[in-house]
Amino acid sequence: MSMQTAPIKKITLNHLQAKKNQEKIIAITAYDALFAQIFDPLVDVILVGDSLNMSFFNQNDTLSASVKMMLYHTKAVCAGAKTPFIITDMPFGSYKDEKTALKNAIRVYKETQASAIKLEGGKEKAKLVKTLTNEGVIVVGHIGLMPQFVRLDGGYKIKGKNEEQQKKLLEDALSLEEAGAGLLVLEGITTPIAQTITQKIKIPTIGIGSGKDCDGQILVWSDMLGFFDSFKPKFVREYLKGKELVQNAIKQYADDVKKGNFPNELESYH
């Protein structure tokens, strides 16, 4: 008689770290309860990303996202998804110093059911990561292409193309791991250095536009499901023509209304 493993009720950091070199971590973004509930049984990690400022609020970058905004959407995601490990982005300016970072990270933990917070930056953030973890906050690091630095960088630029950048990325990864980061997001870095970092550090790496050798992958759900056709990053694979499917359904609905075919007798009360 074979023993069946009981389904995991809630994915924890320990579960994710146990996947290192064993099984790929599946991650996706979500910003509301509806989609979080749909994604719940299919993914390990849901990121409530400040990317919502672009994909949800139609802004040019993530910089105007606020703590209030992130709390609102994190609460919604936590209401819809019960099993995945839920990470909340710390928005631009919310961790500019230790006092501010502690205040906002603790607020996230008190007001939502988020599993962890994510912040951008390399070894210069190591002391802050250590301070947060000492207070019981799980921190996810984020290095490489960092959207909160897009104006400083002059655009969305791939990192790791030269030896100097590769050395810095590895130093950043090792420093964040030593400081206590539980996971590390690698965004927009060349495949060889992403592979090196993944091999050198003991915590899992989750890649976005950083090659297949990371311990897991994440995509913005609206990119992956084909809801934006104005611009598609090279690293995005569309698994659905979502915009086209929804528009066709709305056209059919509008046509039925105009022709008097909706509602019909079965859809009406008497």
UniProtKB/Swiss-Prot annotation:
InterPro entries: Pantoate_hydroxy_MeTrfase, Pyrv/PenolPyrv_kinase-like_dom, Pyrv_kinase-like_dom_sf. Its cofactor is Mg(2+). It is found in: Cytoplasm. One of its GO terms (cellular component) is cytoplasm. Binds 1 Mg(2+) ion per subunit. Belongs to the PanB family. Homodecamer; pentamer of dimers. PANTHER family: 3-METHYL-2-OXOBUTANOATE HYDROXYMETHYLTRANSFERASE. This is 3-methyl-2-oxobutanoate hydroxymethyltransferase. It comes from Helicobacter pylori (strain HPAG1). The gene is panB.
